[in-house]
């Protein structure tokens, strides 16, 4: 019984796991491989999470791939398909669908995640930009969730194909069933690699901290 309760809690936390860092509308590009992995912790309590995804570009607008979420006594595998297009410098739109399956329960279907990605530049030099992610998660045994992540970011170019991008934003539910949460962090770009330091729940006793890395080849 205790294990079942822990797994249900893990499923609840996994709804937010894939949406911690900002996702942009564009896909990886034709014939390219994108990978991302992260570790999430809450200092002071035993609640570690990992999230990993690999995506392969099919043309300039589509990508397909897999992902894996692990939490306390929980593990979920997902297959994804993604679409994205650039409408203009100021507005881009994309989306993603991910059915996920419980690796600890005979690979049974667990939940379906659907995402809408919007982003664009605010200034002509492309340094200041905005980004929103909307996640609709339909669970097999729990009520659905509908969350929104809204960020402002500023890109600071450095030397030798490097840059630093701090971002700040808020997380809220379109169902208005939870308080608005602050989120933010930065990523450091080195050529085709990004190193992430992120977090949310800053005003709680155990904030969530994320360290991640991604690449494109």
Pin down the residues of each PLM region:
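Transmembrane beta-barrel domains of Gram-negative outer membranes and organellar outer membranes
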Residues: 19-126, 130, 134-137, 171-173, ...
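Intrinsically disordered, low-complexity peptide-like regions
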Residues: 3, 14, 146-148, 153, ...
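Compositionally biased, intrinsically disordered low-complexity segments
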Residues: 8-9, 159-161, 213
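Cleavable N-terminal export/targeting peptides
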Residues: 1-29
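A mid-sequence, solvent-exposed acidic-amphipathic segment
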Residues: 131-176
